[in-house]
Amino acid sequence: MSIKIGQASLGETGGRNQQPGNQTGRELNISNWYNGRWLGVLRYKSRKKAERAAQTCEAAIKNRNIGYDMSDRNTAYEAARAVGWDVSKITKPVETDCSALMMLCAVAAGCASVEALYRRQGNSCTTYCMLHDWPATGDFDLLTGSKYLTTDANLLRGDVLVSEGHTVMALEDGKNGEGEKEVVEKSKIIVDGKEIKIYAEKNAAD
């Protein structure tokens, strides 16, 4: 049985120039994990932020005032900011898209550097921006091993899966989730010509 994922998928008739709000009930939705030819998984270094992001994603999906439309993709973000990032309090119809929803969730979770990206760009990130800019914020690890991209077994709640044109959030831990939280990953870097071992704990605290 696959884990559940949250996503913004498609408007009532397509991707652009849609009616505000979730007209079909499936524009934002919870679905089963699938192999979407993922290029990377963005994992929150803080489990607390991961949980806040997942809760925001779930709340956005439940709020039928939030729909899908690439043309007005930032209106949900601005509405969320106006209510202190509690998306359940959005009472007027607004829009988002797949990557704009993930950005909203990250900012609601307390990722100040992601919020700074939005301010600098004047726009939510695309999937390209997510893969290239989010790891540099310090809030995320970018995981590209096949065990994260081709199966849900090693995913954690709050993980953000990114492909060339779509992004979703894991809303449950995979079957190996406990091991993922506890494992200490050994990596190596070269400093002044010398190899130095670095140990990074996956379930880093705030």
Predicted segment positions?
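Short alpha-helix capping/helix-loop boundary micro-motifs
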Residues: 140-153
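A short beta-strand micro-motif
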Residues: 4-8, 161, 187-191
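Active-site signature of cysteine proteases
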Residues: 175-179
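Loop/turn positions that initiate beta-strands
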Residues: 155-159
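Short beta-strand-centered aromatic/proline hotspots
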Residues: 166-174
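Short, low-complexity, charged amphipathic interaction modules
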Residues: 182-206
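Short, basic/aromatic beta-hairpin or loop at an interaction surface
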Residues: 112-143
